[in-house]
Every structure is written in C-alpha cells, then in structure tokens.
Amino acid sequence: MAQGTLYIVSAPSGAGKSSLIQALLKTQPLYDTQVSVSHTTRAPRPGEVHGEHYFFVNHDEFKTMIGREAFLEHAEVFGNYYGTSRETIEQVLATGVDVFLDIDWQGAQQIREKMPQARSIFILPPSKIELDRRLRGRGQDSEEVIAKRMAQAVAEMSHYAEYDYLIVNDDFDTALSDLKTIIRAERLRMSRQKQRHNALISKLLAD
C-alpha cells in the first residue's frame, strides 16, 4: 500500500487557511484525506468530541508524552499545551491516507526536522489591505488588538519561503483549485505511483 503524505499548511490569521482545508476535505473521501487531530490539555468546549476535535489529556499525561518524545511538535499557548502525536500521524499515513496539519511556522520547522518527507504549503492573503479587512471582519476587536494581530501576521508571512508551495488566496475558489492541484500532483509522484501500481508494473515488465 502506498504511504500517505503529510501536508503542513501555514498562513497568517485571516488568510483563509482553515476554510480552505475544510473545503478541500469536503471534496475528498475520508479514506483519502484527513485532518490531524492534536493533543491538548485545555478543557473541551461545548460540542467538542474527544478523538474528533482533539485528544484531551491532563498536564501530567502531556508532560509524560513530551518525556518519551511522543510529539512531532508541541507548544504552550496561554497556559495550555498543544501537540501533534508522531504515532497517530504515522498510523494514519501507513494506511495510505493523506494527513493535513494546520500549524504555524514554528511548528512547521519542528515537523520538517523530524519528517523531512512532509510537504509544506503556505497561504498568503492578496494584500495587506485585504488582510486588514478580514482581521476586522468580526467587528469585535479594538484597534490595539487589530494592530497586534497584523504584526503577528507579518511575522508569520516572513517565513513563506521555507515552504514547498505558495498559494495566494485572492479568490477562494481559485485558491481551493490550487490546493487540489498540489494534492493531485503529489499523488502522481513516482514514489507513490510505484507503490500503488506495483503489481501492474511487475506484470507489464514480466517476460
């Protein structure tokens, strides 16, 4: 069976990364593509399901996993830990399923060091003006918060060149088509096609 591909997807807040991933998943069968489910120490929010949205664990369990190097990457955010389990990812990839990991540039660097075969995609907004408009979309944040989020977005975007692919999300449908094209091209790589069609190739080359 052909090994699945791990896709690292990063973008500044407001670039439409999560919406693009969710739209892509709706067009792909579950046995072909899945989104990574992270471990976290934060409490479940209403409607969240263990194993579907996150794997919810306590701080001691999480630290034990860190100690045995169970995570491809992990980070602390506002007092809670978040991490990507190496075992979980590898088990899914071994079934031939592609896995999408929605993560920032720092997490992406950690994962590339441990899984250099992963493919990485960065998504940019079409302009700062449009990014500002999207960041203001909720209409609930102060100017100070907007300015902070914009500064964080610029810092995130400065790492775009570290990725394999670049998508500019000006038109959503076009960006989604670009994302699908990347996935299709990766599935046609020689390494995956040789695994997938091994029996056919053997028969074709037999005397």
Curated annotation (Swiss-Prot):
Protein name: Guanylate kinase
Localization in the cell: Cytoplasm
Reaction(s) the record says it catalyses: GMP + ATP = GDP + ADP
Cited HAMAP family: Guanylate_kinase
PANTHER family recorded: GUANYLATE KINASE (PTHR23117:SF13), GUANYLATE KINASE-RELATED (PTHR23117)
Chain residues that bind ATP: 11-18
Domain of life: Bacteria
